[in-house]
């Protein structure tokens, strides 16, 4: 029985572009996420 390939192939640029700060700030929902994390006092807001 063959196993599937490992699906997590780390890539910092892709990580930032998909989950980064600038992407979050683009939409109203994204800004809400940032605001919630600021309210909670998260040390890191985004990837």
From Swiss-Prot:
It holds the Pfam family Ribosomal_L34. GO terms for biological process: translation. Keywords: Ribonucleoprotein, Ribosomal protein. GO terms for cellular component: ribonucleoprotein complex; ribosome. The keyword Transmembrane helix does not apply. The keyword Disulfide bond does not apply. One of its GO terms (molecular function) is structural constituent of ribosome. InterPro entries: Ribosomal_bL34, Ribosomal_bL34_CS. It comes from the Bacteria. NCBIfam families: rpmH_bact (TIGR01030). PANTHER family: LARGE RIBOSOMAL SUBUNIT PROTEIN BL34M, MITOCHONDRIAL RIBOSOMAL PROTEIN 34 FAMILY MEMBER. Belongs to the bacterial ribosomal protein bL34 family. This is Large ribosomal subunit protein bL34. It comes from Mycobacteroides abscessus (strain ATCC 19977 / DSM 44196 / CCUG 20993 / CIP 104536 / JCM 13569 / NCTC 13031 / TMC 1543 / L948) (Mycobacterium abscessus). The gene is rpmH.
